[in-house]
From Swiss-Prot:
It comes from Deinococcus radiodurans (strain ATCC 13939 / DSM 20539 / JCM 16871 / CCUG 27074 / LMG 4051 / NBRC 15346 / NCIMB 9279 / VKM B-1422 / R1). It is found in: Cell membrane. This is Glycerol-3-phosphate acyltransferase 1. Belongs to the PlsY family. GO terms for cellular component: plasma membrane. The chain crosses the membrane at residues 5-25, 52-72, 81-101, 111-131, 138-158. GO terms for biological process: phospholipid biosynthetic process.
């Protein structure tokens, strides 16, 4: 591993670790970790603060994934390192040192990574995940479905091995991060889209 690659990985992790949801909520006088699901992500911001702040957070979180991959490319690193930098950004988002190694579930940041690695895969996954979310009214169901769609498509599309490995890892991590949501969906206690925190 070269010093450049090591620097890119570290910077990617730190970019991903920027807790946009937590910091924006704090500026509004809210501790996002103590309301709703306690998750530092756009969905919890939507329920706690509304559409505008949620859109800002989602956009920033997507950008984190995009920037990590572009950083590796700008530094002249290979496609393998670019994919790994994307993964590190999502890990940073999910396990941020700024939030005692807690964070979000990585949906938006994973989308940013996948979209920059393979725009067709990213767009297809996004459209189908949004459709699932709209039909079920569950954000978590759309996110989980998106993970399965991305994982399935990357296995059949002609993609480099490292891109394929990165997408499969991100899909598996996203499903794991939603394990509590899966339990709530099974129990019928998951909040639907549009429900405010009590």
């Amino acid at each position: 591993m070269t010093l450049t690659a090591l620097l890119a990985l570290l910077l990617s992790y730190l970019i991903g670790a920027i807790p946009a949801a937590a910091w924006l909520a704090r500026a509004r006088g809210v501790d996002i970790r103590k309301v709703g699901s306690g998750n530092s992500g756009a969905t919890n911001v939507l329920r706690s603060l509304g559409k505008g702040p949620a859109l800002l957070v989602a956009s920033f979180d997507i950008l984190k994934g995009v920037l990590a991959v572009l950083l590796a490319r700008a530094l002249g690193l290979s496609a393998e390192w670019a994919a790994l930098c994307g993964v590190l950004a999502v890990i940073g988002h999910n396990f941020s040192p700024f939030l005692a190694f807690r964070g979000g579930k990585g949906v938006a940041t994973s989308f940013g990574v996948i979209a920059i690695l393979d725009p067709v895969l990213g767009l297809t996954t996004f459209v189908l995940a949004i459709a699932c979310m709209w039909l079920t009214r569950f954000v978590s169901a759309g996110s989980i479905m998106g993970a399965f769609i991305a994982g399935a498509l990357v296995l059949v599309l002609p993609r480099p091995t490292w891109d394929r490995a990165a997408v499969l890892f991100l899909a598996a991590l996203l499903v794991w991060q939603h394990r509590e949501n899966i339990r709530k969906l099974q129990a019928g206690t998951e909040r639907r889209l549009g429900e405010k925190v009590s």
